[in-house]
Structures are given as C-alpha cells and as structure tokens.
From Swiss-Prot:
It holds the Pfam family RRM_1. Interacts with NCOA6, CITED1 and XRCC5/KU86. Interacts with SS18. Interacts with STIL and interferes with its interaction with CPAP. Interacts with gamma-tubulin. Part of the HDP-RNP complex composed of at least HEXIM1, PRKDC, XRCC5, XRCC6, paraspeckle proteins (SFPQ, NONO, PSPC1, RBM14, and MATR3) and NEAT1 RNA. It comes from Mus musculus (Mouse). Residues 307-354 are annotated as: TRBP-interacting domain. This is RNA-binding protein 14. The modification Phosphoserine is found at residues 161, 220, 242, 244, 256, 272, 280, 520, 523, 527, 562, 582, 618, 620, 623, 627, 643, 649.
Length: 669
C-alpha cells in the first residue's frame, strides 16, 4: 500500500527516519521523501491502515504535525491559484496550511515572492481567493487570484513542470510574450506550478517588426526548394566546361579559330607550340627562337613573307618563323595539326633518329656545328633555312620538292614558289619546276638522295659555318658560300634524285630530316598558305588534309574551310581567356541560346536594400547563395526553383538585369 505523508520537512527528514517510524506497523517496502511530503510503501494493507491511524497528527518535529493518509491519485482537474507578493519569511507549509482551511490543497509551491496553490475543487478555490486576497501574511499583503493559465488537467500533466493548456491573458493575444513577460507583466503567466522549474509558454516566433531590414536568408522561401536543384542538377555548371565547352572551346583553335588565332601572337601560343610538338621539334624550335640572327632576319622579312617572298630573307624567316607573328600564330592555330604532329614523332622521330644519327651527314652535321659556330648552329638546328645560305638553299630545294610532294594542286604552286625565290634560286628554277613532275621517281632514289645529302653537302656543310657568321647578310652569304656548290648539287641531284617528293616523307635526308621535318610538316600547313600568292593560297587551302606530306598532319577542318569561313575566322575577335565565371558558350552562331539557363545561374532578383545583411549568407553553405558574398564559389549558383525567375527568363536577361542594379554594386563577372 502507498501511504501519503504530508507536512514533512524534506530538508532535515531522511527516508531512513521515516522507515523507522513506520516499521512497527508492518513491512516497509520503500520510502521516498520529497520537498514537503513523502511516500511510504508498505506490504500489508492492515499494517498500512494501522500506521495511518497511529501516525496521523504525529509531530515528527516540534510544531509539525504529520498528515498521514492513504495515497490517492491526483484529481483530474485542479484549480491553480496565483499568490503574489509573498513574504520571504513565509514558508510553503505555512501557506499550504492557510489554504487548507478552505479546502483540500493538492500542491503548494513557493517561488521567490510568489506562489502557486493547486486546490481540488473550484468552489474551494474561489472561496479561498475571496477570503485571502489582500490578507496580510508575515508582514506583506498577498495578492490571491485564479491563475490565468487555467486549471490543470489530468494526473500525468500535473507531474510536469508546466501547464500546456493555460489560456493566455487577454492583453497578450496579439504578441504572446516569451515565457510570460507580456505587455502587462503577469507572474502567473511567467511561472507555472512546477517545483522550481519556471513554467513558461513555448517560445513563439518573433514577430516581423523590422521586415525590411532583415536578411534575405530569412525572407527566402523554404530552403527545401533550393536543396532539390543542388542534387537534381549536379552537372549544370560543373560538367559544362568539359561537356558543352569541350568541343566548342578546346577543338576551336584548329577548326574555327585557326585563322583567327593567327592574328594575335601570344607568348602562351609560343609556349604551347613549344610544348606540343615532338622531342625532335622542341629543342630545334626553341633554339631557333633563341637565335638572334634568325630572329632578326625573321622580323625583317615578315612583310615579304606574306607577299612575294625574296628567297634569302624568306627562308631566314622560314627558319625564324617562330618569331614571325603570322607563322607563329599559325603554329598556335593548328591545335589539331600540332596534336597530330605529336602523333607523328613515331614516324618523324624515327626518321630523324635513324637518318640523322646514323648517316655520315649526321656526323658532318654535328661536327659542322661544333667546328665553327656551335652556338649559332645549335640555335639554327630547327631554323634550317635561317642557318645559312647552303642550308637555306637546301631548305628551299626541299621546300619546292616538298611542295611538289602533296598533290597536283600544290605542284602547281611550285611554279610561283620557284618564281618567288628567284632572287637567290635563280640558278635552279628549272630544276625546281621540273622537280614535281618526277615525284614518282623519288621513291626509287633513297640511296642517291642519302648520298647526295652526305657527299655533296658534307663539303658545303664544312664550308657553311664559315659563311654562317654572315647570317644577317643572307643574300651575300647565299652567293658567296654555297651558290656554286649547292646550286650545282641541286641542279644535278635535285632533278634526278631530288625530284621525287613521295619518297621524301618515307626516306628522310640524313641532314635535313630532323630540322626540316620538325619545322615543316605542322608549320607548312599555315606558313605556306601565308607565303603563297592569293590564288596559290586558295588552292593550297582547298587541298585535302593529307596532301602535304602523306601523313595528314594539317587539320582537315582548317584546310577544308572555305575562303569565306577563313575570312570570317580572321575577322573573329581574339577569344578571351575563359574562367569559371565566363557565361557558358556552346557555339558562336547563337550566343543567346542558353539565356534562360544563364539567367537562372547569374540573374539575381535581389535589390540592393536586401543585400545589407548579405554576410549572413555564409550560414548556409550550399543551398542558398544568391547575392555575392566573399569567394568566387558564390557565383556557381545552381538554377533555383524561384517563382520570380519566370519574369526574368527572357533572352537578354543577363544584360538587362544588370541595368536595374545599383551603380555601386559590382557584379564582379
């Protein structure tokens, strides 16, 4: 049986003391002492009845008579009375006894200078209020009234620290206070009937007093609508550079910007050209760039390069073509050509390695550089034409035979090409023009060609470094050193053994394979087009991509471009360097196709007044980034499911929205 023991001072009463008090009447199962009462569990009902009869009114402490009775469930409804202005000297027991004279008191809690008394019956509560309100207790006049939070319902709720069914005061319905601190402060609303746990209402949402100045973060729609696009569209921006811009931008240089690139010489293109070709090209080309003599010659002959090209200076430009704006950019333009060039080292590098390293001419070629002017010769390793008159003549001879090699349309150009070079090649135009005709016979004379390269050139090569010192006086050098020997050689050998262009790609010359190959195959595609007369250039561009040297190095897209397309590409402004912030651009012909997507990504319908608190946006890392805050990642906003975006989804949204911005607001695009 459960026995209720009231009027117990929990501060100085222990469970053991109560258990000893009830032990003579039966077996005590447990004893629990609360603040002002206790519960004793006894095994036998008879013992419990005897204990109640014997101990009710017993004074455990002087002046404190115990209230011993059978424990009953708490009434379902209790009436909560608020007692204010309670003296600090008044204890809860004294207050309880005061109210018990008017009816049964279920609970009495004193909190600082006020208290809550729960009475079982409504009539008792009203009688107590009427009799005790304004009564002086311990020197203070108490204020007794029915708690505005209403009555407690149910035993389960009575144990809790606060009432969840209390009615708010009439003055607090508009803006319910936090925990009872309302317009007119009410102790009853602020604190419930708990034993020390202050019973306040659950915190209401703060009213929007200053709605205008609040952060856009808190004014926004529910964030669930922003999280969905984050996961549903993960590839909208991040996958774009590789998907939509991959073909449009990376493949551009060779296809659509081939000629457009040519108009803007950039160091980056030179570097990219240096990095792209094979090993055989890398060092000679860099050396050619480093050669001041070839550079100066190249710079001086840039003008003639595009027009009728004097052979001496033109060949030096051919060697110094890295510095030339037109040919250098054509290098950069042939992105795919250079890519294929990178694939060619298997063949070209093999040619160069086998012939250049093995043949006698290779040794003479190296010794020649070491003999007299190793620095200038090393610099001219790739600028074979700029290297000397001898090599330039050989270069010219190769150029003509090389031009003879691709097709009939190019062999048709060999005539103007030979005429172009008439300044220093005057002794060989006949051989040059006749040379393409014997293209088929070239394959039959690899030995002759190799021998020619080794034996006649060896002597001239030995003499050549002496003339190399006069590299700038290229015309004089051509006539001084090698006009005789080399002219005789090309007249004799070029017609017979030189004239077959088909074998030139298969059977590289011992001396000229590496230098000429490294330079010619990728660069001829653009540089020859720049060198030729207009009609020759037109026919040259019209040739199939594999016509140059049988390996299809020049980009098919670049060569098959019509003249109109070439002109358009030439007129295209240089493409700016793309960044993460660049608007997506899938093609050149329809720049507004993705305007809606751009508006969803970049369009911001935030006014400047709403951006005053934009630093708070860092609280939400991913789902809601609308106004620019700190880092560039903030601009990678995904399309948001926002209702207002439908109004701004026009084609020119990205441009018109900026006009509505405040002038001091930087888009930082």
């Amino acid at each position: 049986m459960k026995i209720f023991v009231g009027n117990v001072d929990g501060a100085d009463t222990t469970p053991e003391e109560l258990a000893a008090l009830f032990a003579p009447y039966g077996t005590v199962m447990s004893c629990a002492v609360m603040k002002q009462f206790a519960f004793v569990h006894m095994r036998e009902n008879a013992g419990a009845v005897r204990a109640i009869e014997a101990l009710h009114g017993h004074e455990l402490r002087p002046g404190r008579a115990l209230v011993v009775e059978m424990s009953r469930p708490r009434p379902l409804n209790t009436w909560k009375i608020f007692v204010g202005n309670v003296s600090a000297a008044c204890t809860s027991q004294e207050l309880r006894s005061l109210f018990e004279r008017r009816g049964r008191v279920i609970e009495c809690d004193v909190v600082k200078d006020y208290a809550f008394v729960h009475m079982e019956k409504e009539a008792d509560a009203k009688a107590a209020i009427a009799q005790l309100n304004g009564k002086e207790v311990k020197g203070k006049r108490i204020n007794v009234e029915l708690s505005t939070k209403g009555q407690k319902k149910g035993p389960a709720l009575a144990i809790q620290s606060g009432d969840k069914t209390k009615k708010p005061g009439a003055g607090d319905t508009a803006f319910p206070g936090t925990g009872g601190f309302s317009a007119t402060f009410d102790y009853q609303q602020a604190f419930g009937n708990s034993t020390g746990g202050f019973d306040g209402q659950a915190r209401q949402p703060t009213p929007p007093f200053f709605g205008r100045d609040r952060s856009p973060l808190r004014r926004s729609p529910p964030r669930a609508s922003y999280v969905a696009p984050l996961t549903a569209q993960p590839a909208t921006y991040r996958a774009q550079p590789s998907v939509s811009l991959g073909a449009a931008y990376r493949a551009q240089p060779s296809a659509s910007l081939g000629v457009g690139y040519r108009t803007q010489p950039m160091a980056a293109q030179a570097a990219s050209y240096r990095a792209q070709p094979s090993v055989s090209l890398g060092a000679p080309y860099r050396g050619q760039l480093a050669s001041p003599s070839s550079q100066s010659a190249a710079a001086s002959s840039l003008g003639p390069y595009g027009g009728v090209q004097p052979s001496a200076s033109a060949l030096s430009t051919y060697g110094g073509q890295a510095a030339a704006a037109s040919s250098l950019n054509s290098y950069g333009a042939q992105g795919s050509s250079l890519a294929s060039y990178g694939n060619q080292p298997s063949s070209y590098g093999a040619q160069a390695a086998s012939s250049y390293g093995v043949r006698a001419a290779a040794s003479s070629y190296n010794t020649q550089g070491a003999a007299s002017s190793l620095g200038s010769y090393g610099a001219q390793a790739a600028s074979y034409g700029a290297q000397s008159a001898a090599s330039s003549l050989a270069y010219g001879a190769q150029a003509a035979s090389y031009s003879a090699q691709p097709s009939a349309s190019y062999s048709a150009q060999s005539a103007p090409y030979a005429a172009q070079q008439a300044a220093s090649y005057s002794s060989q135009p006949a051989a040059y023009v006749a040379q393409p005709a014997t293209a088929a016979a070239y394959a039959s004379q690899p030995a002759a060609y190799a021998a020619q390269a080794t034996t006649p050139m060896a002597g001239s090569y030995g003499a050549q470094p002496v003339v190399q010192t006069q590299l700038n006086s290229y015309g004089a050098q051509a006539s001084i050193g090698l006009s005789g020997s080399y002219g005789a050689q090309s007249a004799a050998a070029a017609t017979g053994s030189y004239g077959a262009a088909a074998a030139y790609g298969a059977q590289p010359s011992a001396t000229l394979a590496a230098p000429y190959r490294t330079q010619s195959s990728a660069s001829l595609a653009a540089s020859y087009a720049a060198q030729q007369h207009p009609q020759a250039a037109a026919s040259y561009r019209g040739q199939p991509g594999s016509a140059y040297d049988g390996t299809g190095q020049p980009s098919a897209a670049y060569l098959s471009m019509s003249q109109g397309a070439v002109a358009n590409a030439n007129s295209t402004p240089p493409p700016y360097e793309r960044t993460r912030l660049s608007p997506p651009r899938a093609s050149y012909d329809d720049p507004y196709k993705k305007a809606v997507a751009m508006s969803k990504r970049y369009g911001s319908d935030r006014r400047l007044a709403e951006l005053s608190d934009y630093r708070r946006l860092s609280e939400s890392q991913l789902s809601f980034r609308r106004s620019p805050t700190k880092s560039s990642l903030d601009y990678r906003r995904l399309p948001d499911a926002h209702s207002d975006y439908a109004r701004y989804s026009g084609s020119y949204n990205d441009y018109l929205r900026a006009a509505q911005m405040h002038s001091g607001y930087q888009r930082r695009m």
